[in-house]
């Protein structure tokens, strides 16, 4: 039963990460699996589950705070192209994304669909 709960938790983490960020599902899944595994191990060793939960919540707050402090705004077309190129693993795709974002503006929506046609 614990394994099923853990598996459902990991699936939900991946889905939420994809819905909110559109990226990072592998990292979120690995982190969730580690939290479940280590949490169960600690509870089995006698740790208080509520104490573990409070510790995890404090750690999440600290990590979030640290990430927000180190985050950098991506504003220019060149910055968008560089960031998107890294995420896509291809600078030319980064350029396409930056161009599309330039055309639709900050409030615009860009839909990307997979194509079966070579080169498109």
Swiss-Prot record:
One of its GO terms (cellular component) is cytoplasm. The keyword Transcription does not apply. GO terms for biological process: protein refolding. Gene3D superfamilies: GroEL-like equatorial domain, TCP-1-like chaperonin intermediate domain. It catalyses: ATP + H2O + a folded polypeptide = ADP + phosphate + an unfolded polypeptide. Its EC number is 5.6.1.7. ATP binds at residues 23-27. Keywords: ATP-binding, Chaperone, Cytoplasm, Isomerase, Nucleotide-binding, Stress response. InterPro entries: Cpn60/GroEL, Cpn60/GroEL/TCP-1, GROEL-like_equatorial_sf, TCP-1-like_intermed_sf. Signal peptide: none annotated. The keyword Lyase does not apply. One of its GO terms (molecular function) is ATP-dependent protein folding chaperone. It is found in: Cytoplasm. Disulfide bonds: none annotated. Belongs to the chaperonin (HSP60) family. Together with its co-chaperonin GroES, plays an essential role in assisting protein folding. The GroEL-GroES system forms a nano-cage that allows encapsulation of the non-native substrate proteins and provides a physical environment optimized to promote and accelerate protein folding. Forms a cylinder of 14 subunits composed of two heptameric rings stacked back-to-back. Interacts with the co-chaperonin GroES. This is Chaperonin GroEL. The gene is groEL.
């Amino acid at each position: 039963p614990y394994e099923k709960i853990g598996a459902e938790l990991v699936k939900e983490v991946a889905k939420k990460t994809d819905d909110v960020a559109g990226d990072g599902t592998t990292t979120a899944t690995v982190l969730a699996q580690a939290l479940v595994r280590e949490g169960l191990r600690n509870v089995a060793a006698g740790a208080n589950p509520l104490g573990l939960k409070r510790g995890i919540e404090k750690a999440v707050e600290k990590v979030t705070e640290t990430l927000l402090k180190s985050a950098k705004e991506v504003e220019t077309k060149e910055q968008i192209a560089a960031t998107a190129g890294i995420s896509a693993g291809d600078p030319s795709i980064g350029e396409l994304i930056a161009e599309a974002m330039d055309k639709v503006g900050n409030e615009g929506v860009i839909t990307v669909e997979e194509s079966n046609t070579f080169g498109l």
